[in-house]
Amino acid sequence: MCYLLRRSVHTEFYIFHAKGLFMGKVKSWCRANAMLVISLLAAVVTAFFVPPDRDYLGYYDLKTLACLFCVLAVVGALRDLHIFSALSQRMVHTFSTVRGVCTALVVITMFGSMLLTNDTALLTFLPLGWFVLSSTGQEKHTALLFILQNCAANLCGMITPFGNPQNLYLFSYYDLSTKMFFFAMLPPFILSTVLILLCCLVFPKEQLSVPEAQVTVDSCRAVIYGGLFCLAVAMVLRLVPYVLGLTVIVLALWFLDRHALKTVDWGLLATFAAFFTFSGNLARMEAVHILFARLLSHGTILISALTCQIISNVPAAILLSRFTQDACGLLVGVNVGGAGTLVASLASLITFREYTHHVPNGGKQFLFLFSGISFAFLTILLAAMSFLNG
């Protein structure tokens, strides 16, 4: 009897322990994929008000999803080749001061975001920034460097249609011409670039020695992947049918680098799909449609930027596009709105996660500095755009 009792107690203990481990993993996954969880909940809640029907099929912009997938997949393949590290290190090793190296890293992130999307640029170049600073004993500058790299990725990637996910979506949704897109984004891009470069002057001119790092690149694959990247860009610019481009890129990577297909940010794609459902349902609710249409009539840039502070810029772009035809105003608003709160851009969460990974006890100090710089950028950019738009 005692044996059976002990066995029952042990069994209950193991079950309780297993449940605890499972719930811990669920909580950890939810924290790591917070935006996906929120978007799925939002889609489910709105589905109670607008039950699923055939109209749901019209919510999803398959071209945007295909283009985003292709860009992420090809960039993943290029990262697997370490080509970005090789190019970045070559630039970094030409500078000899803290200011020079940190400015180079910020500029690399800036140009990287124009070609690779903002989140991919940060995933690629933040670790390089930590490597350089930690290997030269300059870890104290990590927070400021990461914040300026984050600003560069969020605010300078706005100049290209594929510089961030919301641009890719709006460029496709409104069927914008490249010329219209470029001229709409040029003023905030120039101002953002100037502000970021001015902030880089804060870094000291202290001399340092950056250790050499051996990085080998397969030149043959680099050429092939470069061609695939050009194909992905051509898809975004509507020079190539997206079905054809998707087929070629998937088949090429299937044979050359399946790992790149596995490392695609499927959570981001799922987030897009969920927010397509959420925004589509909201657009079919008459009261919501009237509310957003009325708000946006008072200033698309301001309202969209403020919306980003609460639900992030990608969801804001998808949601608000249903209620306004002011494509340029919405473009500027959701890009400028990437500054401000930590949740204003998905890329900012990547930066915070990377920083706390290297400096586990520095989260509060980082958030304080991040908020000060980011809100300053947001205020200046909104004031400038308000002045330019009369």
Sequence positions of predicted segments:
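Transmembrane helical segments that form the transport core of multi-pass membrane transport proteins
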Residues: 59, 81, 85-88, 228-325
